[in-house]
Amino acid sequence: MLVLPVSVAIGPAHAASRTTRGLQALYDFRSSTGSIVVGQSRSGAAPGLKISDTKAVTRSEGSLAVRGKTLIRTQKPATTIIESIRRSGEITIEAWIQPAKIDQSGPARIITLSKNSSERNFTLGQNGDRFEVRFRTTKTSGNGIPSLSSGPKSLTTELTHVVYTRSRSGQARLYLNGEAAAEQTIKGDTSNWNRSHRLALANELSKDRPWQGTYHLVAIYNRDLSAAEVERNFHAGAGAETTLAQNRPTPGEHRFETEVAPLLAKHCLECHDSSTVKGGLDLSRRDTALAGSKHGKVILPGNAAESPLWESVDANDMPDDRPPLSAQEKKILQQWIDEGATWSLETIDPAIYTHDRQAGTNWVRRLTLEEYIATVESTVDVDIDQEAREILPPDLRADGFSNTAYNLIVDLKHVEAYARLAEIIVSRMDVIDFAAEYSQSRKLTDKSMRGLISKMGNWVLRGPVEDREVDSYRGISTTVASAGGNFKDAVGFILEAMLQSPRFLYRMENQRGDGGRWPVDEYELASRMSYIVWGAPPDRELLKAAEEGRLFDSAGVETQVERMLEDPRAIERSTQFLHDWLDLDRMDHLRPSPERFPNWDPNLASDMREETIAFFKEVVWEQKRPLSELLNAQVTYATPRLAAHYGLQLGGDGLARYDLSTVPSRGGLLTQGSVLTVGGDDASTVTRGLFVFHDLLRGVVKDPPPGIDTTPVPTRPGLSQRAIATERIANRSCGACHSKFEPLSFGLARFDGLGAYHAVDEHGNDLRDDGEILFPGAAKPVSYGSSGELMDLLAGSERVSKTLTWKVTQFALGRPLVSADARIVDSIHAKARAAGGTYASLISAIVTSDLVQTTRTETH
């Protein structure tokens, strides 16, 4: 096959950008001097390549021409690249090259990850007028034979874009200048890849397969790029500026974002942000911070000693009424100013740093109670709901959700409960019928049982069972047989053991690596996807997709997510998020004062919860509206009892749908009893304001200093809740913090502690529902004239929309988000918003993001 190098670009291209997902090493030969070829990857630096004989090469910006015999190799084994591809089982090798001549053979090594002429993990080489790729698997030779070659006369001395991809299922393809040139199935997996091999260009490690020509770009991915991605990289051109280079922060920017901004957020923004501006100084925004206070500039770049900010911090005058900065924190601040005070963020958002103390910890995820119940039912078709809720300890909330991994501990009560439940589950199963799905044999022989255990375990434990695990479960059947038991007994006891296995009760993942982010394997990804979308284990279709390697293709993942979102379990999972986010369990414990609310009907608490769930399903699933419209959608669901409580004209029986387009005071989550009751009997402006501040605006406020009297002030004739709040805001000791959140509740003032609407309170005080809202990060507040206008402002706010993205993402991951996640969450939000901002689009964006596709590895 003859492939002509048509429209090949050397210089930077503007029509397309290169794909970077899964990129493990990129060499673009930007440097024109030296003996080291510098590399980069998505996680930082890739291993450098040392040129053994610099006289044999000519370097210029964007290219490296090999004119004589040399070897360009890593000085150590390419461990990160090797381990990453061992895990993924996939690869893409990409090069922009110009061969110097046609008669190079051996094959002559263009790119190789190998030891010598007969031992390799892979090699891209030249054999005369063809390209040849050798890729080692458990089904090939140690030399990567059989190989894949392009057709005769496909290699020329023109600039050529050559790409080799190999999927986990074994499908290997060779592309030349964006077009498919050859394909072949290379069976086996990469578990036998040698960890000691080095990456090299222009020769074999044994220096006996030299190649001459010019390199413009070399890239290695741990996944197989799709044909569209290969074409995209081709059209980007040989000299395309990579997204990695464009987006990587400078050392100064990195220091500001990882050290200085968190320091300012922690110690300074309580008094010096857009809402307080104490002393006329706002340190939350770049323009205002560098402009200074009403007394002048406080930061003099390059001169900490004369910067008022540093002087006040160094003297422990600031922060006021709070502990001073530590010696290390002071050093960071001083050094930052002296080095030029680089300020790379337009706005410092304290919310993204709130949980950074947990940033370096990987928590193994135990199944929550809801997930355990769903997993049992999906795996063995047994409904264990009632018994599980009675026997298992409840999951406790932490950081706003009950599925927070670090709080999902296992104690002796859990161990005993899981053992009891496993026995109950197996007693309800038709064990023989269940085993028949995996083996028709009823023998207790080693061959029969090992095959059954392997196949059954793959389903029950959500992935392949290792030999040592098979040995362990096989020991159970051996013990049963020696005691006179039969096949049914053996399978029953094996199932009980599997149902108590950490692999069943936890979402176990391989986290060993180099400390960077590595891709999860196909079965780990399948479990992540299913528990995010369904709160349940992968079904057979998803496991099949994992087994066939279809989940390492973004289109394959999106296809599965789209299918999964059509399943009723996706709706159930979304309502679990809603239930957890709004803490709807509160309604089970709602006990209003009978003196204040003599007409309270305890059944209203359940009605309020059902209202919110039905409303959520209507907006999110029936109308498929953007999540932010949960704040102002003019519809609700109510029983006759709840409708009367709200003062609505009665509709149908049971839980009926109500159109609120003519009821301006109601519409959206904040006007529903399940949320309004967060303020307690007194309809507290503090707790309601904090709810809006924390859960809708992602605002941050510290606890009050020691010694501050926090006793609630009661209302009375002439003193409403708003008047009390206004006095607090004006108080020097309280106002700096309370001004951030209490005004957020003013628009809810006409709703009493149980959500009923009134124009006056119980003392006859007029209730106003107008006010102002200052969105975090904004320079100026926005006024509203009624609760309805407030709801519209919230629904239209980018801050609220992004907060919902953060909340759903946190629930999906089962952990608080940290500053290292912020850029990825921003991209998730942008992708979801471009697709309509719906729940479905958000879930799809989360699942296809690096937060789900990769894991943070540990070095021990």
How does the language model describe each region?
Residues A16-R18, R67-T92, L113-S114, G144-S154, ...:
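Short surface loop/edge beta-strand patches of beta-sandwich-type extracellular domains
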Residues M1, A13-L71, S114-N116, E231-N247:
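Extracytoplasmic low-complexity segments
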Residues R134-H161:
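Short, aromatic/His-centered strand-loop micro-motif at the edge of beta-sheets
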